Amino acid sequence: MELALKNEKVNVKTIFISYYFLIFFGIGGLFPLLSVYLSDVVKLSGAQVGIIMSISPVVMIFAQPLWGIVSDYTQKPRFVLMSTLLCTGVVGFFFSFVNDYYVFVILAAILAFFQSSLIPISDSIALNYVQKVNGDYGSIRLWGAIGFAVSVLAVGRLSEVFGLHVIFYVFAVVLVAASVLARYLPKESQTMNVRLRDGVSSLLKMPKFVLFLLITFLVFGPIFANNFYFSLYITDIGGTLTGVGIAFLLAAGSEAPFMKVANGWIRRFGMLHILILSAFISGLRWLFYFIEPPLAIVYATTIAQGFSVGLFIPAALQYVRDLAPANVRVTAVSIYAAVGNGLGSWFCTFFGGLVLEKYSIATVYGCFGVLTMFGCLFIFFLRRMEQEKESGI
């Protein structure tokens, strides 16, 4: 009996590993090259490309909480995930047939709507599972980082051989395969014992949850905006497009080992201490870029993304789920993701563009550093709130 349970645990973990690898392989193969496709193949202007690329974070602000509510209300997150994975892959496939700018805008909005459900619901299911079996979320999630890193090289090479259209075909095939795998993920369901509206309202009335949303905005906003501006920074200080690819590979690849040790560090040092450490290192990285160091040193500092993302994501997700009532956990994770991936990403991307137009790309990173350090400061406030609660003050 014990052996059977152990084998089942191994099989479920293998499914999770394969699932996360596929999802991030698809994302890593499409989005880093999408702007190149729109510019070089479709011949859209820089402004048009910028508008299309900025649609996703705006849509996510509204769509991610909606999918969380749907998942919690139906109590069928696995079915919701299978459906949205399939729709995301199909919409991505249709990109390859389009040449009109306005159709691209519509497709980008639809793609973002379905895609916005993938990571929050997947993470919620994974966290629910590892908490039940006393497992390690980081050892599962790191395969997403590996999938992204491998995809940057593999799909980039395929694009050179077969043309940039291949990014949509790979994206569609991989996400459909992930949809099939999602069927075998463990079920996550809770008995609804309060009205959902009351549950969501209770989340927004929790001072610690609201403060953590602000922290997520300040820390994750610059991290996601960096995906848009880092290539400009590299080329501005003398790097090449190949160098940009190497930098993204190093950054994404560095997340995996830190995700592997994240659970052990969280248990040893505590969630909030890990959040402070990862946010502080992220802030130092952005401030360091403000002084425009030599290119070789910039490449070396990409490993800081392992600290900032590889440690912050597991600790933040666990904190949100532990904080939220059981019946609205997916909603809580979705709101958290919408604030970081959506609102924070949009604000920092938009604000960064204004700063870039008036000053320089180095100044953009200086602003990112200041925002992140404010986020780090608020984590100290959150830690103090936790300590006061424990001491009964």
Feature locations, PLM:
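Hydrophobic core of transmembrane alpha-helices in multi-pass small-molecule transporters
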Residues: F21, V91, Y101-I119, F217, ...
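Helix-to-loop junctions at the C-terminal end of transmembrane segments
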Residues: F62-Q75, S159-E160, P257-G270, L356-E357
